[in-house]
Amino acid sequence: MNRRNSLAGLAMMVAALCAACGSPPKERFYTLAPSPGAATAAAASAQPRTSVAIGPVRVPDALDRPQMVVREGANRVEILEQQRWAGSLRSEIGRALVDGVGARLPDAQVSAAESQAARSAAYRVAIDVERFDATLNDSVSIQALWTIRQDDGAQLASGRYSASEPTGPGAYDAIAAAYGRTLAGMSGVIADALRSAPIVSSAGK
């Protein structure tokens, strides 16, 4: 009887180990836009005098994927299957910029270019991401071209934004947070350029 019980117990242990080995690693999802704060709420409650559409956002083909990509050397990158963006990288960057620019321009309605609200936008901000690099436990860096146009296509301003942020410890959460800080800086640059632009009311279109 004891031998039978031992064999049965061993079989259960083996089955449990096999089940554990067969379980796929858990996927984790990250966002580049922080939770809405007081500044964003204040911007949303103000009466808009003009409107801004953020987008389109273009990213390099190698990064246009749901997985987080980290650099492993000068010529090698790793695609992390279990570390993923909550949406497409383009939409995550766009949403972070919508939130960041909107928080800094309380008198403007800021929305994503593909949204219904953006159809009558007085200004459009195109983003062309040239670099979006991360090194685990080190830093992230971005470089992007931005261009502001009026609704008639006339270019008002453009520039190239470059920034890097240390990640420190914290692995992938720290990478997402550092990217968020770089995009917050870019939001400030774009907002400053929009403040200098002549005010065009979307209501009069």
Map each language-model feature to its residues.
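N-terminal segment of the mature soluble domain
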Residues: 49-117
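Bacterial N-terminal signal peptides that target proteins for export
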Residues: 1-10
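Amphipathic beta-strand/beta-sheet edge segments enriched in Tyr/Trp
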Residues: 135-165
